[in-house]
Amino acid sequence: MDSTNLNKRPLLQYSLSSLGSQITKWSSSRPTSPVRKARSTENDFLSKQDTSSILPSINDDGGEQWYEKFKPNCLEQVAIHKRKLKDVQEALDAMFLPNAKHRILLLSGPSGCSKSTVIKELSKILVPKYRQNSNGTSFRSTPNEHKVTEFRGDCIVNDLPQMESFSEFLKGARYLVMSNLSLILIEDLPNVFHIDTRRRFQQLILQWLYSSEPLLPPLVICITECEIPENDNNYRKFGIDYTFSAETIMNKEILMHPRLKRIKFNPINSTLLKKHLKFICVQNMKMLKEKNKWNKRQEVIDYIAQETGDIRSAITTLQFWATSSGSLPISTRESTISYFHAIGKVIHGSHSTNNDNEMINNLFENSNNLLSKEDFKLGILENYNTFNKGEFSISDASSIVDCLSECDNMNGLPESNEYGLREVRKTFRNISKQGHNHGTVYFPREWKVRKLQNSFKVQAEDWLNVSLYKYNAVHSFRNITLEFGYYAPLIRKCQSYKKKYILYYLKNLPSGSSGPKQTMDKFSDIMKVENGIDVVDRIGGPIEALSVEDGLAPLMDNDSNNCDHLEDQKKERDRRLRMLIDQYERNVMMANDDLEDEETSFNDDPIVDSDSDNSNNIGNETFGRSDEDESLCEILSQRQPRKAPVISESLSDSDLEIL
């Protein structure tokens, strides 16, 4: 056996038990220049890889997946745009400095767009650059030092729950600085679909951002964003159950924090995909020629590059085609079309095809009924002016708006959506376009209006419960909307302020004075106001304008338009209602007790005739009548009734003269 092999340390994977993470080992003998060659032919690329012996030979296949076999081993091999690579490298490089502006780098984008790959390759360059060994001496060989500490969601530490393991991971990661410097990578997130787990995850991220420690290792979070198709996906709902993105996982406080840097990734363009797929075909030239597929490689590569922007899916599809014995149809991984992507295709068209009808048909087939929803037409209305930076005639804009209006009038017909989208695409296709700048895509403001309406209804129900159970007053929803929704909380707020200074005044009165009781009686209405019960803020929130926002920013967790915030309002309404019902029942019970006390005291104190001399026989009398009165009445009843003389009621002449 060669002596060099005996002295060579085996490549093993270590895991820090206190962190619950997987440590990936990297080789230090790698080029460090991030600059990529402008162009290179297939033969030049092949000879370069053969001379450097970076990639394994095709003879030791052994059934290995190609996306693992041909994964990048240096920064130059990563499929990423030069400008995006520069942005990530500059942001990550600045995070290693002592007084770094950012503590967390958030990379978000679709699957297979080289998010985590570029971070791992950059760590090979930046971690050794900034790592400080104690006393300038390295006690371990450089190739085996950990450059990336990655959180593993399936790794349980000391039988702790998942979030406790994640918390312990972050606590231990704080010490990976100076001579132990390592880049912290979080790609495998905890179960953020569970609301309590998601909130705990957000709290831990905020603790990292607000930490008072002057020196922390760089923390990189990679989020693979996607649309989650559901049969009951309703356009009126938005949340992590339907859209897995940074906006639904994080909250607004995290995403807007000054110590967090976010970089959005796009799907890999067809040029980069073709370059890497060609290189893989060259590496497997022998096998492709044996299967008589070498001459068809370019056609297959072009098809795969147009169908997907996921490099892992593209490589897997190429491997399936190359290793199959027969000529099977090529199909890439099913990719959902996002809301903004579909809007961009309708307004700006598609680069993959010039046939607009075919493009619209593909959208209807692959969009999971997204194009049939009302929000999509509103998105077209909100963003049609972004075409060519708004430089088109007013007649074209009028025809687009008229088309969408006609589509609304035919809303009951299934063909209405197709008519509207095809007419819009036809109008834009006939407009001369300058350049390829599509501008920013905005989310329709109608979504905010609907969410604010739902929030207003919940708050109105809450105020109505207080008015009914506490003040015994009932109001219609119309009156709440027009009058009470604004003025009633304002009055209660003023009364609450008056109650505070009245209590302060009573507190400072001298003891023994009669002022407190008189003041409490005089201002009894004001003293009824309770901050935990009464609504003192305007129903629906403060009055403000609705502005358009790009992306999914208006739908974040702690935004007033989000469904999670609406659920919190419902919980607050139910909590207040339970308190009101309990208080109302206590008041009713107290009133019933007082009424029973009055009835009991009345029965114990009967009415006595003070004129009666025989007070001892009062119990034998009936309604104040004695036995003698009874006998007298019996005697009188046996006598014949007397006849009174008839008196003429008419007046004589003399009587009239006297009058």
Swiss-Prot record:
Subunit structure, as described in the record? Component of the RAD24-RFC complex which consists of RAD14, RFC2, RFC3, RFC4 and RFC5 and associates with the checkpoint clamp DDC1:MEC3:RAD17 complex. RAD24 interacts with ECO1.
Gene Ontology biological-process entries: DNA damage checkpoint signaling; DNA repair; mitotic DNA replication checkpoint signaling; nucleotide-excision repair; reciprocal meiotic recombination
> At the top level of its lineage, which domain of life is listed?
Eukaryota
Q: Which GO terms describe its molecular function?
A: ATP binding; chromatin binding; DNA clamp loader activity
Q: Which InterPro entries match?
A: Checkpoint_prot_Rad17_Rad24, P-loop_NTPase, Rad17/Rad24_fun/met, RFC_lid
Question: What family does this chain come from, according to its entry?
Answer: Belongs to the rad17/RAD24 family.
Q: Which Pfam families match?
A: Rad17 (PF03215)
One cellular-component annotation, GO: Rad17 RFC-like complex
Q: For ATP, which residues are the binding ones?
A: 109-116
Biased-composition ranges, Acidic residues, are 596-612
The primary location reported for this protein is nucleus
Role this protein plays: Participates in checkpoint pathways arrest of the cell cycle, a mechanism that allows the DNA repair pathways to act to restore the integrity of the DNA prior to DNA synthesis or separation of the replicated chromosomes. Regulates the DNA damage checkpoint pathway throughout the cell cycle, when associated with RCF5. Component of the RFC-like RAD24-RFC complex which loads the checkpoint clamp DDC1:MEC3:RAD17 complex and is involved in DNA repair pathways.
Species whose genome carries this gene: Saccharomyces cerevisiae (strain ATCC 204508 / S288c) (Baker's yeast)
Q: Does the keyword Ribonucleoprotein apply?
A: no
Compartments, as annotated in UniProt: Nucleus
Q: What is this protein called?
A: Checkpoint protein RAD24
Keywords, A to Z, come to: ATP-binding, Cell cycle, DNA damage, Nucleotide-binding, Nucleus, Phosphoprotein
Tell me the residues on which Phosphoserine occurs. Answer: 652, 654
Region of interest: Disordered = 24-54, 596-659
Q: What else is known?
A: Present with 752 molecules/cell in log phase SD medium.
